[in-house]
């Protein structure tokens, strides 16, 4: 069908949103250190960071474009030893003293930073989680002794990855971190702070490890973010305050509620208005209206759309350099907005967001004009969960509201995304008015959200999906590739195998519970756990057992590659996915040969 894009010009559901905001009492708002002095109200519903050191200004531009560090993120994670005013005064003096030579060189800038800044991550401290125990009960659910050792090692990594922000010895505004009240688990390596969507899998792993106190503390942190900013930022740094990430908070709360057997009603009562508030943010600031050219019917779906007209501070050099491909301010602004929106998607970056005519070239990025299948699948599941939560608390009118929202979304997704020939769901491009029919793991994510129960898709039709994808789902020893498009600069493509996507693929396959889908799912679970186990085992003596951020589909136990930084170890979401699978399927997992 032919759809024409219309930008939403009015605030949706304003009455409900106003009610929710008014009824957030002070008792529900935790104390967090104020960072509002460095925020301004930006487009797209976020308060963009205006910090003169970490987000804007000559100092940031000079440091990043000189490439004092190989990784642009290093500088913006370095706390200041003295006030903003002093740092700027000293920097201006440096510029004056070196003006005859064309400005400071890399060595002079490095010396300036050493004198006036602490090392990156100085204010982030390890902490021992209060609820960690050496022998969690889930280990009894695993049959293979090798996998028991593997699981115990992963469980032990929570001790290595749990952090707190400690800014007590730093001056006001002298750091980029967003302080929170409770300990949190980081991803690892360069990712020194908490991240929004990573935490969905981290929290699942914590719940498997019986660490409900730590998990609940992280949920409270996110609730505080929504109360403070209206949404959950990409991560725990002020330079992330112009964007969010895939909205998985509602599903995190649901996982906690399930793990505690629905007993923590008091917490649900506390957090539900905040979940409502986040939902309304996404429905107010991240929507597009599409009209059916044949029937005139309009539908509303969500997309990533960050208002941004400058390089991301943590990737300043890369963004600035790429933007030089454009001659006009309008083109650069579109690029910067789409780059930030690609980061908001979590898939930073993928051919999904590129121009169909040149989909391996990052400078063709057009994320703001792509309506994604996975985002709308996430929100569909959120709507069903929110309806259930409100029904649990006796809020029948809100339960009916969310049920209606989910039904409207299913109808819209079927109209806009569904391919009747392949039985897959494909992203929709607003510029070309066409669907992207290439294979991506996101193509079957609606099955994870159990859309099949709402559209009367029978088991035979579901099996047709998996049979048509058998060459992708079972052909690679290291797991299911993100796409079949190869581009070295696009890490969310090609042969990279990402833990969150493997989780979603496995759950999408296992949710329908057909004989064929269960067979395919079992095969994939075995391959995925094998590649993680082998990567861990081969580095056990030298590195203590490495858990990578991503893996290579072609090889067992080998990390993936590409993108803006080297492959990372740790790793929060890998640990969470593996613990979840080891508990759920631990009695039946078969390790393949390394």
Swiss-Prot record:
Superkingdom field: Eukaryota
Binding of substrate, residues: 190, 197-198, 234, 243-245, 312-314, 346, 564
Top class in the EC scheme: hydrolase
Entry's family note: Belongs to the glycosyl hydrolase 37 family.
Listed name of the protein: Trehalase
SUPFAM superfamilies, alphabetized: Six-hairpin glycosidases (SSF48208)
Source species of the chain: Dictyostelium discoideum
Chain ranges passing through the membrane: none
UniProt-annotated glycosylation sites, renumbered to this chain: 56, 70, 97, 166, 242, 261, 305, 361, 395, 513, 537
Known EC number: 3.2.1.28
Active site: 348, 549
Catalytic activity: alpha,alpha-trehalose + H2O = alpha-D-glucose + beta-D-glucose
């Amino acid at each position: 069908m032919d759809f024409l894009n219309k930008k939403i010009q009015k605030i949706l559901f304003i009455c409900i949103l106003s009610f929710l905001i008014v009824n957030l009492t002070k008792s529900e708002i935790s104390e967090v250190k104020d960072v509002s002095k460095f925020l301004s109200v930006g487009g797209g519903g976020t308060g963009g960071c205006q910090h003169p050191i970490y987000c804007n200004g000559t100092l940031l531009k000079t440091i990043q474009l000189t490439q004092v560090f190989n990784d642009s993120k290093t500088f913006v994670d370095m706390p200041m030893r003295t006030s903003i005013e002093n740092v700027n005064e000293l920097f201006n003096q440096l510029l004056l003293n070196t003006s005859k030579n064309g400005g400071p060189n890399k060595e002079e800038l490095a010396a300036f930073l050493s004198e006036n800044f602490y090392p990156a991550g100085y204010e982030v401290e390890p902490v021992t989680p209060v609820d960690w125990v050496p022998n969690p009960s889930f280990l009894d659910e695993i049959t293979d002794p090798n996998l028991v050792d593997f699981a115990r090692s992963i469980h032990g990594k929570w001790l290595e990855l749990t952090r707190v922000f400690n800014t007590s010895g730093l001056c006001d505004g002298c750091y980029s971190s967003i302080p929170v009240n409770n300990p949190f688990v980081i991803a690892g390596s360069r990712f020194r702070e908490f991240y929004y969507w990573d935490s969905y899998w981290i929290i699942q792993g914590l719940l498997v490890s019986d660490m409900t106190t730590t998990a609940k503390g992280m949920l409270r942190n996110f609730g505080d973010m929504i109360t403070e900013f209206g949404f959950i930022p990409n991560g725990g740094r002020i330079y992330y305050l112009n964007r969010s990430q895939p909205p998985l908070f509602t599903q995190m709360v649901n996982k906690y509620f399930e793990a505690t057997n629905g007993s923590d009603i008091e917490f649900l009562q506390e957090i539900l208005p905040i979940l409502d508030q986040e939902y309304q943010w996404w429905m107010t600031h991240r929507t597009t209206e599409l009209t059916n050219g044949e029937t005139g019917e309009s539908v509303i779906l969500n997309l990533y759309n960050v208002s941004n007209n400058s390089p991301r501070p943590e990737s300043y050099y890369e963004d600035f350099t790429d933007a030089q491909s454009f001659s006009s301010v309008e083109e650069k602004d579109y690029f910067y907005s789409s780059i930030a929106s690609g980061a908001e998607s979590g898939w930073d970056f993928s051919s999904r967001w590129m121009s169909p005519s040149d989909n391996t070239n990052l400078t063709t990025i057009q994320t703001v004009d792509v309506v994604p299948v996975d985002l709308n699948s996430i929100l569909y599941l959120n709507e069903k969960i929110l309806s259930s939560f409100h029904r649990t608390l006796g809020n029948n009118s809100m339960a009916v509201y969310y049920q209606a929202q989910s039904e409207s979304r299913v109808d819209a997704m079927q109209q806009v995304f569904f391919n009747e020939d392949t039985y897959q769901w494909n992203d929709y491009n607003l510029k070309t008015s066409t669907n992207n029919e290439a294979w991506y793991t996101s193509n079957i994510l609606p099955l994870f959200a159990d859309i099949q129960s709402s559209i009367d898709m029978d088991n035979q039709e579901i099996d047709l999906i998996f049979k048509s994808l058998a060459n992708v789902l079972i052909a690679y020893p290291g797991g299911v590739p993100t796409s079949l498009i190869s581009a070295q600069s696009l890490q969310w493509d090609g042969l990279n195998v990402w833990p969150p996507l493997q989780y979603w693929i496995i759950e999408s396959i296992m949710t329908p519970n057909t004989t064929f889908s269960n067979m395919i799912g079992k095969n994939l679970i075995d391959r995925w756990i094998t590649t993680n186990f082998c990567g861990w085992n081969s580095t056990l003596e030298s590195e203590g057992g490495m858990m990578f951020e991503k893996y290579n589909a072609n090889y067992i136990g080998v990390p993936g590659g590409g993108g803006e930084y080297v492959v990372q170890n740790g790793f929060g979401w890998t640990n969470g996915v593996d613990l979840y699978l080891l508990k759920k399927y631990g009695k039946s997992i078969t390790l393949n040969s390394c």
